[in-house]
Amino acid sequence: MNNLSYLEPDYSEFVEVDPTGRYGRYNEVLGKGASKTVYRAFDEYEGIEVAWNQVKLYDFLQSPEDLERLYCEIHLLKTLKHKNIMKFYTSWVDTANRNINFVTELFTSGTLRQYRLRHKRVNIRAMKHWCRQILRGLHYLHSHDPPVIHRDLKCDNIFVNGNQGEVKIGDLGLAAILRKSHAAHCVGTPEFMAPEVYEEAYNELVDIYSFGMCILEMVTFDYPYSECTHPAQIYKKVMSGKKPDALYKVKDPEVKCFIEKCLATVSLRVSARELLDDPFLRIDDGEFDLRSVDMEDSVGPLYRQPHHLPDYYNYPSNSSSLNRQYSNGNYPSNSSSLNRQYSNGYNSHHEYQNGWAYNPAETEETHGIELFESRNNDDQEEEKKSGNVDITIKGKRRDDGGLFLRLRIADKEGRVRNIYFPFDIETDTALSVATEMVAELDMDDHGVTKIANMIDGEISSLVPSWRPGPEFEECLAAAAAANAASICNNCVSNRTSMGSVMDFLRTNPGANVIQCCRNGCGETHGRFEEITIRETEVRLRELWKLQQQQESRELSSIDSGHNHSEEEEEEEVLYEDPENMFSCEAGNEINHISGSGSFSFMPSKYCDEPSEKTENQVQQELRWLKAKCQIELRDIQDEQLKTRWPESGEEVEISPKDGFLGSVSGLGREEDTVKEMFGERLVPKCLKRTTSLPVDAIDS
């Protein structure tokens, strides 16, 4: 049975031997790449088959000195001994033929990519087992001093002994011992190369990036950036921070999060040791993780592993018809030889439908977790969740050509979220901004697609040349910021790359679309500034502002000796209600009682008539707010009593007049009058912010 009859007569004789005479190479090619050819070879001392790897240097090296240096580096690699590193028996440089030859162990199941393609149905537990073995091998390489970096890690360079589930890192012939002079070379496969490799300044963490791409390849069966047709396109995407499209096919949140952790920027990327301690890879011996890793099939259904799978439904791990002694080479494709009698006494009756193994148990209720998105189910869920909220969006063009948008989300309970954010039409897409917004502001109840479509529609109205459409090239840009604590700075945000709401309001005083601080207290989340208010709080604040304006007009009339015009008395104040835009005239809204701090309501034709109970509550709250402002003003006034006049230098004592302490907003509006009386240093500019008291002050 086990004989060498499959070898042709020409392969029975050595065509080349190593300098020691121990290893002989046959003319049988097991695999071939761009610069390397793998032959079957034999170890005469041990009597085992090995793999003879031959690398053509061509113009890689320009002098004999370079060859000698490379020989010394590769020779050190045979000292690496680890159970998850391919055994490296010997290596030498053939200077005459400009070849590098190295002999390694032979594997029964080929590369991890070939093995994964043959076995499409793999439980996620098995994938975690492979990941742990690969990480142990990387940790061993990186623990050397100086570290050894692989520089070309991919599933084609990871090998499997399928009968034992053993995974080993191979193809170390192109690896280098990390030194300053040796690490500065751009080597590897473009799809698996980290951004810092293109910059030719990197360390051992480039292998972690490649490892993340290997997991993505194991899950999706595709090379990363398979959507690109040219290496230049891959380079552009990698350097701009765009992740491969295949990443967005992964639905399992744990798998996706683990991959993103490996693909993080070099400053945030973790080591192999830290990844081994990651909760994702922790599975106790008695624990069962029943999620299956399936490949998305465009022609057939996606079957999931049932919760209870009898032993006789499991495929054998090893089959002599499939696992022939091939390594590093081409493998026969799947055949119908699986449908035969196995040694365990059970018949396999699985039939193939569209390339998938069919199992009767899989037609029943399943409990697996799919790794790929089901767009129809997601859309239905989003529509169900978004039915309880009203989402609108408005935008405005800035002087520099940029856009500033406000997203307004109102629910049935009267809670309103106003989210202000900039939008760069050159670099941003509606989908990327919507995805970032949902992650930053924890907006799980609102669909990303719906928000993206609304952003597209508003931008199209502001920029006629805008071309809307979803693009899945962008991913979450601030994952670390999403976990950071949200700190409220009383609506004064930190400066972002696109500016802030406060900067926009200062530079655009006449903006009607953007209304912010008077309605609530804001929080900054990355580029987004959020102000959350309630409908009753909006009404309360507007009434308080109207009373302040009435008192300030009376004060100004007494201090300046002239009356305001009839137009100023009838000045309108606009504010936004959750349902409509209300216009309440100050003269009709407030009937001020001279000499008292109370007021009465006179409903206008645009405002709802409040009940007696609501009116009493509003009066009580306004009296509390007024008293608080008066206390603050008295404290500031006491500190300024001994301030000198700028011109004469004489000490001035300020005597507050009746009603002077009644309005914070009045001081802001009558700033010129106060300057004439007391000088610029007496103007309490900081008091302007009390017109936007925090929401918490009203509830206390």
UniProtKB/Swiss-Prot annotation:
UniProt feature, compositional bias: Acidic residues: 566-575
SMART domains: S_TKc
Active-site residues (renumbered): D171 (proton acceptor)
Residue stretches of biased makeup (Low complexity): 314-339
Organism superkingdom: Eukaryota
Gene3D superfamilies tied to this protein: Phosphorylase Kinase, domain 1 (3.30.200.20), Transferase(Phosphotransferase) domain 1 (1.10.510.10)
Annotated knockout phenotype: Plants display delayed flowering and altered expression of genes involved in the photoperiod flowering pathway, such as ELF4, TOC1, CO and FT.
Binding-site positions, ATP: T104, E105, L106, F107, K154
Description of what induces expression: Expressed with a circadian rhythm showing a peak in the evening.
Pfam families (UniProt xref): Pkinase
Annotated catalysed reactions: L-seryl-[protein] + ATP = O-phospho-L-seryl-[protein] + ADP + H(+); L-threonyl-[protein] + ATP = O-phospho-L-threonyl-[protein] + ADP + H(+)
Entry EC no(s): 2.7.11.1
Comp. bias (Basic and acidic residues): 551-565
Single Gene Ontology BP annotation: circadian rhythm
PTM description: Autophosphorylated.
UniProt-annotated stretches for the region Disordered: 314-345, 551-575, 647-666
Any one GO MF annotation of this record: protein kinase activity
Keyword field: ATP-binding, Kinase, Nucleotide-binding, Phosphoprotein, Serine/threonine-protein kinase, Transferase
Start and end residues of each Protein kinase domain: 24-281
UniProt record similarity statement: Belongs to the protein kinase superfamily. Ser/Thr protein kinase family. WNK subfamily.
Its job: Regulates flowering time by modulating the photoperiod pathway. Phosphorylates APRR3.
Protein name as it appears in the record: Serine/threonine-protein kinase WNK1
Species whose genome carries this gene: Arabidopsis thaliana (Mouse-ear cress)
Upper lineage: Eukaryota, Viridiplantae, Streptophyta, Embryophyta, Tracheophyta
